[in-house]
UniProtKB/Swiss-Prot annotation:
One of its GO terms (molecular function) is [glutamate-ammonia-ligase] adenylyltransferase activity. It comes from the Bacteria. This is Bifunctional glutamine synthetase adenylyltransferase/adenylyl-removing enzyme. CDD domains: NT_GlnE_GlnD_like. PANTHER family: BIFUNCTIONAL GLUTAMINE SYNTHETASE ADENYLYLTRANSFERASE_ADENYLYL-REMOVING ENZYME, GLUTAMINE SYNTHETASE ADENYLYLTRANSFERASE. It is an enzyme of class 2 (transferase). It comes from Bradyrhizobium sp. (strain BTAi1 / ATCC BAA-1182).
């Protein structure tokens, strides 16, 4: 890695202070891009820049940016003189002057448009300067985060001051000082999270909470505080996050306020204090550790924080405080899992060994002891580690190792976000992507970067795990009741009813049976003891399930099925984390719970140490499938083993979704890889068996095309398989050569029926998949299998626009190489033909309206069909492909997310729209994976259990379910706006 100590030669210009830079993988291409840009500039400016870039590191940095960061290279090219000015500046002084000058200009501005332009110019110049200082090693990472925070705080202050001065001009506000209208206005803004701690990351949203004191304000007499301050807050968010030709300043997140789904964006201090006193939760206590007044009436804010202090900092380590801490840890364990740390796809923020664990390590101990030890009440994470060390709560070694890891991981996070100005935290999912990133980060190879990353992740994970050695289970303590007393014990019945069981009599009888040890699994004393020890945690987990009573029944079936499963029960007794995971499976996802109850051997997958490691790729899945099938004696046994393999794969992937250890995209790919492997295997098996009965036709070829979710590699736990079967043969000899000969089309129709039966026939182990072949040419009116020539003719002459939209997801998953190539050429020809954009837009919009009329689009939680839902995003991606593939064939991809990336890169989709659609698609995929796993019918939040709501909130990166719904409404509104602007205006 090209790096050394951060540059600290004060007074030197930036170009002379770089001490590190990217490793450029393709220098010729990067040089070409750089020289093309320089050639476009005015000669004297180009000469000046060439001189500045003559030395190694400045040029290396710019080449790395040109190669890996479209966002930063756009900033460089947008204003070459600004870039030159930055290279010649002393960065610290330049940033301070930039903020100061912008403040003066905003103060003098006379229109909102001018303010928005000035703030966006500030952000763009600061973003480029800070990135150069980070990439070039000029500033250490915490100076980078402080600089980012300074820009954000200054922008909020400037915007709010402008708005308040405008309100004073309108006569709605009577400030004590016209030049300082914040003083005494009653409204104040709390910076939360990393902004509050002065640790903002490069492309971070800013988390703000806006409060106002209704008794202390400078409003005109006839102005009501609530609507006034709500309007000001909405205007503040608009000034900062609306996208204009100059970009945006910061995305603003106001959802950390109390009960965001039902409260206004500006909230009175009285209402907030009442909420925190009555309903405040552990995560809100932890969040308030970092709260800081960043703008507005400082005196009112300080008074509010003083009143809030007892909520955050408890004076006594009472039972409830300890329970809160254990609950925080338990939730992280259950939802994030206990993975073997991976490199590809690893989330450096919330993944194992990541930034969140360091923050949690510090915040947990601050919550425990901060009430009695005021010196622990600090905001920055590294400062918290320092005071915890000084107070003997942690060792110097822990502080030093966690500090080093934190700084490293924050730099990784920044570099990820610099690539496209997106708030991402996960490394690329593939080794090639990680290699590209590693070079941008300054490493020469993926291996060296991976070695350092894994070292730090494992260090963090170790310290985090040791923190709770006093109670490694993190389980809650329940009231002492006799769980084996049966339904005649009033206290037990009251307790079970209080936990939320609808049929406490049934539950009590079941518990009595368990503890009586009558099941075969309890035949040994050791197993009975292990089971008794973890029963309170199990009951607690089931009580918070989506369907608690059903989860108890499922677990009872599971125990009865464990005829020889004493080893598993002993394992559960020794590993409470696994108990929590099983309780989550049985509670939140009844479908998985029923599978586990019917097939206890599925538990073996959870014991496998590879379970929480990297997801198996196609090659490994193929090897596992072959091992599963290798000694199958009969066709029926072969089908049974295929079903077992499919169920085990679904169970393990589903459990990883629930535990939060795989992303929706990884899960969708994994489900698709499993299905693809099974389809290919069944295709080969049925081909051989059918030929044994009916022979073969000369020159015969068959192929299976995946469509829909399988084609897009976006499957869920409940996806069926959308397939098309194509065939070809020698038309001069159409008869098969077997004893029961069949001719041409009839042969392949019977073959297709046999293939479908292999998937859908029900054995003792259920069905493999439901098969849907309605996307074949002519749909239900057409034959089950299509001749290749008929398929080509149909796509060229008869297919409707919607059929070509569906064809964008077509993927040949089982065929000979030569036949595959012929099919892919037909698909490409169909997709790449010139089309009328207006006609296609009209067809797509009409199709969307037809779906809305049939399916409805008003249900927020119909993530596919809702206005602004996944159909809108898929239709945009498909529209862009059909319209532009003729001239830009590289836009084609089966994945909507990839299409959006290509479309942005090719300049046919604005960056702002692409970001909105990508973020929305990822959110919808995350939530859809869980809903398909946990809910068999329409999702109704008011009927859902706490477990499921918590899983959904976690998946949506929201503090609670109400905040998730608020985010979902906002997201769907933004997506529908983009859809309308592209297809209906």
């Amino acid at each position: 890695m090209t790096s050394s100590a951060p540059g600290n030669a004060d007074g030197q210009i930036l170009a002379e202070r770089f001490v590190s830079g990217p490793h450029v993988r393709a220098p010729d291409k990067a040089e070409h891009r750089l020289n093309e840009w320089l050639a476009e500039l005015e000669p004297s400016l180009a000469a000046s820049l060439r001189a500045l870039l003559a030395k190694g590191l400045p040029r290396s940095i710019l080449l790395g940016i040109a190669e890996c960061s479209p966002y930063l290279f756009d900033l460089v090219r947008a204003d070459a003189r600004r870039f030159e000015r930055l290279l010649r500046s002393e960065p610290q002084a330049h940033l301070a002057e930039l903020i100061s000058r912008t403040g003066r200009e905003v103060f003098a501005a006379t229109s909102e448009a001018d303010v928005m332009r000035l703030l966006r110019q500030l952000k763009s110049e600061a973003a480029l300067l800070i990135a150069l200082c980070d990439i070039g090693g000029v500033w250490p990472v915490m100076q980078v985060t402080a600089a980012l925070t300074d820009v954000a705080v200054s922008a909020v202050q400037m915007a709010l001051r402008y708005l308040l001065r405008q309100e004073a001009v309108r006569g709605r506000l009577a400030p004590r000082d016209a030049d300082d209208p914040e003083q005494g206005c009653g409204l104040f803004v709390l910076a939360m999270g990393k902004m509050g701690a002065g640790e903002l990351n490069y492309s971070s949203d800013i988390d703000l909470i806006v409060f106002f004191d209704p008794e202390v304000h400078s409003l005109a007499r006839d102005i009501e505080p609530q609507p006034f301050f709500v309007r000001v807050t909405q205007a503040l968010a608009r000034l900062l996050q609306s996208r204009t030709a100059d970009g945006y300043v910061f995305r603003v997140d106001l959802r950390l306020r109390p009960d965001p789904a039902s409260t206004q964006v500006a909230m009175s201090t009285e209402a907030a204090l009442h909420y925190y006193e009555r309903e405040g939760r552990t995560w809100e206590r932890a969040a308030m550790i970092k709260a800081r007044i960043c703008a507005g009436d400082v005196a009112a804010g300080e008074a509010m924080l003083a009143e809030l202090s007892p909520f955050v900092w408890r004076k006594h380590l009472d039972f409830q405080a300890l329970t809160d801490v254990h609950d925080m840890k338990r939730q992280m364990q259950v939802y994030r899992g206990h993975s073997e740390i991976a490199v590809e796809g690893h989330n450096v923020k919330v993944g194992r060994g990541g930034i969140r664990e360091i923050e949690f390590f510090a915040q947990t101990q601050q919550l425990i002891a901060g009430g009695r030890h005021p010196e622990l009440r600090v905001r920055p994470t590294l400062q918290a580690l320092g005071v915890l060390t000084a107070s003997k709560w942690i060792t110097e070694q822990a502080r030093d190792e966690l500090t080093t890891a934190y700084e490293f991981l924050r730099r990784v996070e920044h570099r990820l976000q610099m690539m496209a100005d997106e708030q991402i935290h996960s490394l690329p999912d593939d080794a090639e992507g990680v290699s590209r990133f590693a070079c941008f980060f300054g490493y020469e190879s993926r291996e060296r970067f991976a070695s350092d990353l894994l070292f730090h992740l494992n260090i963090v994970q170790g310290h985090y795990a040791r923190l709770f050695e006093g109670d490694p289970t993190g389980t809650v303590s329940l009231p002492p009741v006799n769980y084996g007393a049966g339904p005649d014990e009033p206290r037990l019945m009251e307790h079970l009813a209080g936990l939320g069981f609808r049929d406490p009599v049934m539950v009590a009888k079941t518990l009595q049976q368990w503890l009586a040890g009558e099941y075969r699994v309890f035949r040994t004393e050791a197993t009975r003891t292990s089971f008794t020890e973890f029963l309170p945690a199990l009951i607690d987990g089931l009580a918070h399930a989506d369907e608690p009573d059903r989860a108890v029944v499922a677990f009872d079936r599971f125990l009865q099925a464990l005829q020889l499963g004493g080893r598993l029960i002993s394992l559960l007794g020794q590993n409470r984390d696994l108990v929590a995971l099983v309780a989550l499976v049985l509670g939140a996802a009844p479908r998985l719970g029923d599978m586990l109850a019917r097939q206890p051997r599925l538990m073996d997958g959870l014991i496998d140490p590879r379970f929480f490691g990297a997801m198996p790729d196609k090659r490994e899945l193929s090897q596992r499938l072959a091992a599963t099938l290798q000694d199958a004696g009969t066709y029926e046994e072969f089908l049974d083993r295929l079903r077992l393999f499919g169920q085990e794969s679904l169970f393990l992937i589903g459990t990883r979704i629930l535990s939060g250890t795989v992303s929706a995209q990884q899960a969708g790919t994994a489900f698709a890889d499993v299905a693809e492997g099974i389809v290919h295997t069944v295709h080969g098996l049925v081909t051989e068996r059918f030929a044994a009965q009916h022979g073969r036709i000369k020159g015969q070829e068959t192929a299976i095309i995946a469509m829909g979710r399988l084609g897009a590699r976006e499957m869920t736990a409940s996806s069926d398989l959308d397939l098309i079967l194509l065939y070809d043969f020698d038309a001069d000899e159409p008869d098969s050569d077997g004893e029961r000969s069949l001719q041409g089309a009839h042969y392949f129709a019977r073959f297709t029926q046999r293939l479908i039966s292999a998937f859908t026939s029900r054995t003792n182990y259920g069905v493999l998949y439901d098969i849907d072949m309605r996307l074949r040419p002519s749909g239900r009116a057409g034959p089950l299998a299509s001749h290749l020539d008929s398929f080509a003719h149909y796509q060229e002459r008869e297919a409707w626009t919607w059929e070509h939209m569906a064809l964008t997801r077509a993927r040949v998953i089982s065929a000979s190489p030569a036949f595959r190539a012929r099919i892919e050429e037909i698909i490409q020809t169909a997709l790449r033909r010139p089309r009328d954009p207006v006609a296609i837009a009209r067809d797509v919009a009409d199709m969307r309206r037809a779906i809305a009329a049939e399916k409805g689009e008003a249900d927020l939680w119909d993530l596919k069909h809702a206005a602004g839902g996944m159909v809108d995003i898929d239709f945009v991606a498909q529209y862009l492909q059909l319209v532009h593939a003729a001239t830009k064939p590289e836009i084609l991809d089966v994945s909507s997310l990839q299409v959006l990336d290509h479309a942005e890169r090719l300049g046919v989709l604005p960056r702002a729209d692409a970001v909105i659609l990508r973020h929305a698609a990822r959110l919808y995929h995350d939530l859809t994976q869980i809903l398909r796993l946990c809910v068999s019918d329409k999702f109704k939040p008011d009927q859902a259990g706490e477990d499921l709501l918590r899983v959904l909130a976690r998946a949506g990166d929201a503090p609670d379910f109400s905040a998730l719904e608020a985010r979902l409404r906002e997201t769907q509104s933004e997506v529908r706006r983009v859809f309308t602007s592209l297809l209906e205006e």
